[in-house]
Regions:
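Glycine-rich, small/hydroxylated-residue low-complexity segments
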Residues: 1-197
Length: 197
């Protein structure tokens, strides 16, 4: 099917960047108005960077007439892990679900990504719990083509979190739980070298 072909092409592209991606069964439903690809037990590993991820189930939705917008839903338990190659940290993030929408530009690069992560718990092997939060919202936006002038936006990242407990912050003025945290960062001008997008 068109969905499985796109997925296989994407997996092969990730190999060039050092990622090994595996999964169990794949089922495609919904054609012709909406294509849903259901992937069981997907996982990804990049030994060189120390990154790994696994999920119970993944849904990828796309419309056959718009191959530049994808909806992603990771169902059930998820785990992302970063183990520093220099053995300076072993971080694990667990969540009960991820929802996202990705938009691909005319040039073939990721131009927008919106994510919602549910019930996030971040721990470090030597220090235990670092952060707990009910939800994290993240939006990443970049232009279709890299900026030329130093005043043009190259990347914009917005992050918000709800009901957050941070182990390192025990300030009485803040209380045990921070109701809402929001941050926005904008990078201006061209980037030197490769970027993750």
């Amino acid at each position: 099917s068109i969905g499985e072909e796109l997925l296989d092409d994407w997996i092969n592209e990730q190999r060039k960047d050092g990622f090994t991606i595996n999964h169990s069964s794949i089922e495609t439903t919904g054609f012709p108005f909406l294509v849903r690809i259901e992937i069981l037990a997907p996982n990804a590993l990049n030994s060189a960077t120390g990154l790994s991820w696994w999920s119970e189930k993944l849904h990828l939705d796309l419309q056959p007439w718009d191959l530049k917008r994808y909806r992603l839903e990771a169902l059930g338990a998820q785990q992302m892990r970063y183990r520093s190659p220099a053995e300076k940290g072993d971080f694990t993030a667990n969540t009960t679900g991820i929802e996202g929408v990705a938009v691909i530009s005319d040039s073939g690069t990721l131009t927008a990504l919106s994510l919602v992560l549910k019930n996030v718990r971040i721990t470090e092997a030597d220090h235990g719990s670092l952060l707990k939060t009910n939800r994290i919202f993240a939006d990443i936006v970049r232009p279709d083509y890299p900026p030329i002038a130093h005043t043009e936006s190259a990347l914009e990242i917005s992050v918000a979190a709800e009901q957050t407990e941070v182990a390192a912050l025990h300030a009485p003025i803040l209380g045990d739980t921070i109701t809402s945290i929001k941050a926005k960062v904008e990078f201006l001008g061209p980037f030197d070298g490769d970027t993750i997008f």
